[in-house]
Structure formats: C-alpha cells, structure tokens
Amino acid sequence: MTLETEVQSLRQVPMFRDIDPARLKLLAFTSERVNFAEGQKFFQQGDAADAAYVILQGKADVAVDSAGQEIKIAELGQNAIVGEMGILSDTPRSATIIAATPTTALRIDKRVFLELLTQFPQMSIAVMRELASRLEKMNAQLAQARR
C-alpha cells in the first residue's frame, strides 16, 4: 500500500476529512502500518489507550467482556477508526478489537492524535459529532432492547 493510498483512506474517515492533504500525508508517514492475522487482537478491553487505529484493509470485530464471555457487538470495515475513545477520555480500552479477516491498519500514536485535535478545531468538532452519533445509536439500541 502506497503513502498516497493511505492518505486517500484517511480522507474517508469523517474526522480527518477537512485536514489539509499535506498534514494527512505527514500523519500517514509517521503512523505505523500494522498487519493483523485473522483472530489477532488489536488490543484487549482494559488495556491502556496508547493509540488509535484506522483500518486500511480488512474487517475487525468489536467485542466486550460480559461475565467472562466475549460478546461481539459490532463489525468495523475499511476506513473505520477505532481506539480514539480511550485516548479522548484517558481511560482503559472499553472493548476488545479482533481482526475478523487479515487486516492492515495505521496505528496513530496517542500524542500525535491529541496534537491533531489541538491544531485542527474542525477535527475536534468532527470527533464530538462522531461520539454523539455513537451515543445516539447506543441509546436507540438500549431502548429497543427494553421493549
């Protein structure tokens, strides 16, 4: 995968859409490319939140521990970002992310991610919108489950 392809993938992530292409190129260049085999974990629920990941290729499952059993709650695909919530809240990982297929991702270090938020207010707004959207979906799911 080329640097330009990685920049194109980053542009598909809502919170990175309005960032200057030169900055995205720098972000892609400084981020670590990580390959995960099917079944391999990006991180485990409870781990320290030290990075966010953008899925470039492949799929990953989001699972949570419930009474000692891992329960899949979502599936993520290409151009999805994961791990940013723990960085923003400075709390341990709230879920486990497992590669559902062979997956390639960009690992964005916590320090770099937080610097981007500081430098680009529009990214901070996009992050807030994404988190609000997730909360809204979760509330709807909870309401549905109670019926």
Regions found by a protein language model. Name each.
Residues M1-R147:
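Cytosolic regulatory regions built on CNB/CRP/Popeye-like sensor folds
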